[in-house]
Regions:
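Pocket-edge structural micro-motifs
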Residues: 47, 78, 94, 141, ...
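Flexible, gly/proline-biased loop segments at the beginnings
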Residues: 1-65, 190, 227, 231-235, ...
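A generic structural signal for well-ordered coil/turn residues at beta-strand boundaries
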Residues: 41, 86-87, 92, 133-135, ...
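Short, surface-exposed secondary-structure junctions/capping segments
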Residues: 73-80, 102-111, 280-290
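A contiguous, surface-oriented mixed alpha/beta subdomain in the mid-to-C-terminal portion of proteins
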Residues: 98-279
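Noncatalytic linker/hinge segments flanking ATPase motor cores
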Residues: 38, 54-59, 85-91, 179-184, ...
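Active-site and NAD+-binding cores of ADP-ribose-processing enzymes
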Residues: 51-104
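Short, low-complexity, polar/charged sequence segments that are solvent-exposed and flexible
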Residues: 64-66, 77, 157-161, 188-192, ...
Length: 294
């Protein structure tokens, strides 16, 4: 996974969880639910019942293994027979997908090619240095005095030059050999053809754009004298536009299930019992509460 892609997913999850004030999910379970929702595009929350059929707890199911059945029920794949849960026992949240209404579609899907390109560029550069800081080449021999034993020794030394300890010299002595009896022909020049820095920079920015995540919160260093907004300003704006809507969606989905008792409703700081943002009175507004003697 691309470093920016994975890091932003965790940052978005942490922002959602940072305001969690309690409810039917523990702090860890809330983080699991938020992360699965962001990563896979959907999350199934199981309503745990007691012997009388009352809902007494909430548990997020692992989104990677959750499947929806034709009859509307849910199954969780595992080693052995799958676990089957009735549709009435599951609160299912999903991101909208215009092509199908079964599973959710992650909102970052448009940036996956950039995330993969970023990863492949890193892997290519790692292999380049692991191979001895070159992209490979051809050992071309034309000297008739080169014996079969010497050819085998050269091939063995070349193979041993890869990986750890790859900076080695090779001595070849061919009696009466020609000047160009042994030649190394490089296949390519990574320094010229591999635009590593540009690929990493552009693809990383594409990933942040796909997540709508501020560069100032992602650790991006400004280049060419560029100036970024302060992290506090970026965080406040992102929280208002991206984090609070997710918190409201989670809180609303649980609150509007008639079987979930109020003490299991998900509570977030800054949101009231209805999942709406708390409003502050205007500076010139006078708030009168009982007992003020007015």
């Amino acid at each position: 996974m691309c470093g920016q892609h994975g890091g932003v997913l965790y940052a978005r999850k942490n922002m959602v969880v940072s305001d969690y004030a309690g409810g039917g999910l523990s702090l860890g379970e809330m983080g699991q639910a938020a992360y699965d929702y962001l990563l896979f595009g959907d999350i199934a929350i199981l309503k745990v019942r007691n012997g009388w059929g009352d809902v007494v707890d909430l548990v997020p199911l692992p989104a990677l293994y959750v499947r929806r059945r034709k009859d509307g029920d849910f199954s969780v794949l595992q080693k052995g027979p799958p676990l089957i849960y009735s549709a009435r026992d599951v609160i299912f949240l999903r991101q909208y997908d215009p092509q199908q209404q079964v599973y959710g579609l992650p909102d970052y899907i448009g940036g996956m090619h950039s995330a993969l390109l970023n990863t492949e560029a890193t892997i290519f550069r790692r292999r380049y240095y692991h191979n001895g800081a070159h992209t490979g080449g051809i050992i071309y021999t034309t000297d008739p005095n080169l014996s079969d034993e010497m050819e085998e020794d050269i091939a063995k030394k070349i193979e041993e030059s890869k990986g750890v300890g790859n900076f080695k010299m090779m001595f070849i002595n061919i009696a009466d050999g020609g000047e160009k009896g042994v030649q190394f022909i490089p296949i390519g020049d990574a320094g010229v053809k591999d635009e590593f820095a540009n690929i990493k920079s552009i693809s990383a920015q594409d990933v942040l754009t796909a997540h709508r995540f501020p560069s100032g919160l992602a650790g991006i260093i400004p280049t060419n004298g560029a100036v970024m907004a302060s992290p506090e300003t970026a965080r406040d704006t992102y929280r208002k536009d991206e984090v609070i809507p997710l918190q409201r969606m989670f809180a609303s989905a649980v609150r509007h299930d008639p079987e979930v008792p109020p003490h299991l409703h998900l509570q977030f700081e800054g949101l009231n019992s209805d999942g709406l943002p708390l409003t502050k009175p205007a500076d010139n507004e006078i708030v009168i509460t009982p007992g003020d003697g007015v």
